[in-house]
């Protein structure tokens, strides 16, 4: 399809993002790429992150740089651009990076195609996620960017500046960037250093590559915001009654924050003792497993669910410490 197929042709209210304001933003009406638009999910947009990301999306800077979101596991780094795309109806592809990934993996590959009548064989180019996003104007999210080998990330330098992309796999086609192409990267590290020493598999990236990003820190949410996220997974019943007691959810969020404070990877932990932390993702899983444990008539639904969703991943010493915190918190 032509590069100009995808274009801003409607507006979306900022209320779609949870903010009370008359402001509206350019967005997309129905298009041929609906299959690539992320599903809209419950998400708490934090103003301090939402505003700079939104500004960047519509700015000329987005044609000269990528946007790197860094923060602890499960803090909403990847969900932020995905859920913004969902509300703007902007097609978006997320790629999970790894140390063996190459630029060719992102560009695409050539396969043999056999004519069913004549038996003649021809080659056909199958575009990869980068090629699709570059050509059509999608958002590309390179998740866990700091897992990439430095030779691969260096090979991507040109795309952050919207330079022409040469498709060697497609007979040397020179592909110009769609003006709406945007690229995000996410990582537990900011690409240059793992201060905790706990992020196994991450690679120190080349400074010249990381210099091509605007970088934002994505910490865990405030207690009240995280509580709202939990509550959104357990809406009231038709009679308006709670399906999950709020006082229990509050204690769960408080416990998650206690664990984070004692996490070795937390720069403010003052010598913490835990080698694993409880993310918002783990917190949601814990709450859902509490419901499951109640339904199967578990002896202690809260502690058993905590084991299933979090503590069983830890060493016996750390698991015992987690269970002790739970007993003190929940009785």
Language model feature labels by segment:
Residues 1-331:
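C-terminal regulatory/interaction module of P-loop NTP-utilizing enzymes
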């Amino acid at each position: 399809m032509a590069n100009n197929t995808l274009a801003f042709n409607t507006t979306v209210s900022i209320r779609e993002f949870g903010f009370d304001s008359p402001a509206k933003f350019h967005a997309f009406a129905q298009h041929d790429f609906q299959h690539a638009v992320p599903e809209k999910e419950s998400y708490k947009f934090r103003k301090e992150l939402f505003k700079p990301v939104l500004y960047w999306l519509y700015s000329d800077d987005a044609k000269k740089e990528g946007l790197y979101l860094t923060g602890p596991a499960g803090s909403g780094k990847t969900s932020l651009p995905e859920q913004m795309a969902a509300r703007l109806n902007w097609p978006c592809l997320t790629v999970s990076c790894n140390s063996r990934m190459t630029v060719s993996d992102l560009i695409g590959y050539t396969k043999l195609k056999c004519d069913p009548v004549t038996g003649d064989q021809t080659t056909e180019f199958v575009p990869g996620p980068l090629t699709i996003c570059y050509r059509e104007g999608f958002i590309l999210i390179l998740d866990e960017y700091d897992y990439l080998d430095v030779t691969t990330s260096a090979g991507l330098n040109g795309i952050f500046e919207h330079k022409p992309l040469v498709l060697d796999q497609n007979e040397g086609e020179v592909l110009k960037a769609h003006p709406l192409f945007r690229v995000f990267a996410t990582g537990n590290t900011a690409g240059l250093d793992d201060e905790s020493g706990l992020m196994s598999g991450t690679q120190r990236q080349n400074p010249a590559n990381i210099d091509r990003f605007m970088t934002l820190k994505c910490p865990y949410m405030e207690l009240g915001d995280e509580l709202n996220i939990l509550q959104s997974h357990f809406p009231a019943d038709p009679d308006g009654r709670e399906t999950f007691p709020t006082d229990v959810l509050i204690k769960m969020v408080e416990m998650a924050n206690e664990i984070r404070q004692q996490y070795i990877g937390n720069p403010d932990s003052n010598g913490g003792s835990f080698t694993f932390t409880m993310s918002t993702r783990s917190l949601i899983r814990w709450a859902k497993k509490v419901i499951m444990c109640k339904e199967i008539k578990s002896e202690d639904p809260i502690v058993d669910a905590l084991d299933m969703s979090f503590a069983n991943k830890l060493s016996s010493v750390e698991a015992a410490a987690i269970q002790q915190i739970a007993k003190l918190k929940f009785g």
